[in-house]
Curated annotation (Swiss-Prot):
EC number: 2.6.1.77
Protein's pathway: Organosulfur degradation
Cofactor(s) named in the record: pyridoxal 5'-phosphate
Gene3D superfamilies membership: Aspartate Aminotransferase, domain 1, Type I PLP-dependent aspartate aminotransferase-like (Major domain)
Enzyme class (EC, first level): transferase
Catalysed reactions, semicolon-separated: hypotaurine + pyruvate = 2-sulfinoacetaldehyde + L-alanine; taurine + pyruvate = sulfoacetaldehyde + L-alanine
Gene coding for it: hpa/tpa
GO CC term, one of those recorded: cytosol
Keywords: Aminotransferase, Pyridoxal phosphate, Transferase
Reported induction: Induced by growth on hypotaurine.
Top-level division of the source organism's lineage: Bacteria
Listed name of the protein: Hypotaurine/taurine--pyruvate aminotransferase
Modified residues (N6-(pyridoxal phosphate)lysine): K287
Length: 459
């Protein structure tokens, strides 16, 4: 098939998109009167659309994914070379890039030993849920089957992962959901539920209260984001994670850390949990693993977890009876190997720390200038600014005005994000997650655009 792509006329591409593509998270009624945006090319942190307009991308592909930036020829070359050698074999066997990336990944994750490949963050998390249920059936007599999740966290788009969605608007109309998934309170100190000095410990103690209410012998695992993403860019309060770890050990509850957003450098360490001294049983990751150059996700476990599935070889049902077809595609791990090399060789973890500090400093300066900013939060290049109608009452800013800020930044040529269709009444946080290659000039342009937008929208 020959594609007629005239670089000077992309109207037929836009027409094909409008006629046939069902876009994610989009109300298509708007496309009866306006064209959908079609991106054509990317380089570094810059994007160009079908009209030729240039944008600075402050959200790494819209969903915190393109960690090393666009246009990485070395990743594309590595994928091409691998695909002509061996493109695929099912995950029941091994491949060279699968083995090599697993080894390199585990070297970055002390205490973890095994890597299970699949395609998306939703899948990676669902694998854990299945593992927890199988462990409950084989090792706990069917008990310890419940999985706890946190208000405001998000873990995926399948029915089971939506059952653990702490973002209610993501789950509306997709139920009923399966049993055994139980919510625990959020840990956003800006909107704290208890007027105490040691809020972090109190928020963690609330998890223990849920465990005791449900019965410790029924709870098998808890899934948590190290830094909550779409629920408002929530960094954990002091003392929170240490207490969570203690509670998990006290009640023999497996700790599942969802690194789908934070993983591979986003917070300034290889993984977000490493910022807080956590020792997890499961770690899941996707987005930044290959920076969007190939589809890959990983479910990483300890040897203790792995051994629970090989202790009875005479039982033909004892192993993990799961498969993910495209978890066997070699493009994922070979892209991930090169992605990891780039992060190391270019010092992107250190850059993330430095540019993250600059981003937070700039946002805090904007908070001094604009009273609509109620709180600034973040870790590394993963930052948010919560907009409020009134600082004293912390009344959330109207969602339409928050989206007007996003739209004005877009009009200036800067793509930022905001919590969207997640939390009823609380979709009021601007979200920034630029590529780990961001420069000081990039950061300043992003925050200057926000400054201009806030001035215009709230004049």
């Amino acid at each position: 098939m020959t594609l007629d792509l005239n670089p000077n006329d992309m109207s037929h591409v836009v027409a094909a998109d409008r006629a046939h593509v069902w876009h994610h998270l989009s109300q298509h009624k708007q496309y009866e009167t306006i064209d959908p945006r079609v991106f054509v090319e990317g380089k570094g942190m810059r994007l160009w659309d079908a009209t030729g307009r240039e944008f600075l991308d402050a959200v790494s592909g819209g969903v915190w994914t393109v960690n090393v930036g666009y246009g990485r020829e070395s990743i594309a070359d590595a994928i091409r070379d691998q695909l002509v050698k061996l493109n695929y074999y099912a995950g029941a066997a091994g491949t060279v890039p699968g083995a090599i990336f697993a080894q390199k990944l585990i070297e970055k994750m002390p205490g973890m030993t095994r890597v299970y490949y699949s395609n998306s963050g939703s899948e990676a998390n669902e694998k854990v849920y299945k593992m927890v249920r199988q462990i409950a059936a084989r090792h706990h007599g069917g008990k310890k089957w419940k999985i706890l999740y946190r208000d405001r966290d998000y873990h995926g788009t399948t029915i089971a992962t939506l059952a653990t969605s702490g973002q209610d608007q993501r789950a509306i109309a997709y139920g009923p959901f399966p049993d055994g998934f139980v919510r625990v309170p959020h840990c956003l100190e800006y909107r704290k539920q208890w007027d105490v000095e040691n809020y972090g410990e109190r928020a963690a103690d609330a998890i223990e209260e849920v465990i005791l209410r449900e019965g410790p012998d029924t709870v098998g695992a808890i899934v948590l984001e190290p830094v909550t993403a779409g629920g408002g860019v929530i960094t954990p309060p002091e003392g929170y994670w240490q207490r969570v770890q203690e509670i998990c050990r006290k009640y023999d509850i497996l700790l599942h850390i969802d690194e789908v957003v934070c993983g591979l450098g986003r917070t300034g360490t290889w993984f977000g949990y490493q910022q807080y001294g956590i020792e997890p049983d499961f770690v899941t990751m996707a987005k930044g693993v290959a920076s969007g150059y190939a589809a890959i996700s990983c479910t990483v476990t300890t040897e203790r977890v792995f051994e629970m599935f090989k202790d009875a070889p005479e039982d033909g049902m004892s192993f993990f009876r799961d498969i993910s077809t495209f978890g066997g595609c070699t493009s994922g791990p070979v892209a991930a190997i090169e992605n990891m090399r780039i992060i190391e060789d270019e010092g992107l973890l250190d850059n993330t720390v430095a540019m993250g500090e600059r981003t937070l400093a700039n946002l805090n300066a904007l908070m001094e200038k604009h009273k609509v900013i109620g709180d600034v939060r973040g870790k590394g290049l993963f930052c948010g600014a919560e907009l409020v109608a009134d600082r004293a009452s912390k009344e959330p800013m109207d969602e339409k005005k928050v989206q007007a800020v996003v739209a004005d930044c877009l009009a200036q040529g800067v793509i930022i994000g905001a919590t969207n269709r997640s939390l009823p009444g609380f979709n009021n946080t601007l979200c920034l997650s630029p590529a780990l290659i961001a420069t000081a000039d990039n950061i300043d342009r992003i925050t200057d655009a926000i400054d201009n937008a806030l001035t215009k929208v709230f004049a």
